[in-house]
Amino acid sequence: GDLSHASVVYSRDERYAYIFGRDGGLTKVDLLQGQISARTIQSGNSIGGAISQDGRLVAVSNYKPGGVKIFDADTLKLVADIPAVYGNNGERSKVIGLVDAPGQLFVFSLWDAGEIWIVDMSDAASPQLRKFQGIGQNPYDALITPDGRYYIAGLFGEDGMAMLDLWNLQAGVKRILPGYGKGEEKLPVYKMPHLEGWAVAGDLAFVPAVGRHEVLVINMRTWEEAGRIKVHGQPVFVMARPDGRHVWVNFAVPDNDTIQVIDTQSLNIIKQLTPGKGVLHMEFEPRGEEVWLSVRDEDRVEIYDTKSFERKASMPARKPSGIFFTARAHRIGL
């Protein structure tokens, strides 16, 4: 299928990969046999997916037609179809930021509607839907914290972010950092940043600032701004080494040949690397000793030692993009 913006989740035993293609295709791949186990074209345009807490359900977020479809992980048979209908005219919204959450939940955002929805799939035959409206303009991506408690949507249509505490749903959506960027001249946005790879280190979170050459630091106890770090370009992914000691950042064009490393104690940039043109994605080994980088424009995957920052290996690959290790099978939201 179309893998231009594809993503992958894994079964609990790490044997099967579920690939979400931009063409609406959902493909189940047997990694041991090296073959496709099942495939379905479930929409015209999809933008990612998630696997349920128990590993029995796979959900896909769709742009066209807007909504979420949920499938049996074994057979890829349709279990639930949730159209993202909003307003009084029956319009359908693009869906983004789909993640799994504890309790057999899927959480996602509606770009056009400015809403966050939660679907409880504890009883797959009777999905329970809960909607939170008026969260802000154009949520463009979202994340769930590693403990599965907070769902946070970045807003493209206005400054700030929308946060939902999944432990206390009755409190509703809270706006955090509402004044961020006020009075500042915004730059053209060359590549939408991704919040999935935001970095958590102790009580601090590091997130890319939309349209700015900055990484935003958030105090997770108060959900207030704790600092801003000037970086080389517009950040796309801000990802923490598994121990949280360092944060690695890649950038949008024209600065996408560069990686910067931030020390999470001093908040200083301690290393700058230039792996090559078109660094699109980063993935750390589960214990953090290595990081793999896709260098699309030079048809390579680079492997760096995260302690010495030296390049350990380089592998040829045709236009590599996302890198997804099977260890993601055991992490919430991935």
Predicted regions: what they are:
Residues 1-334:
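Predominantly soluble domains enriched in secretory-pathway, periplasmic, or organellar proteins
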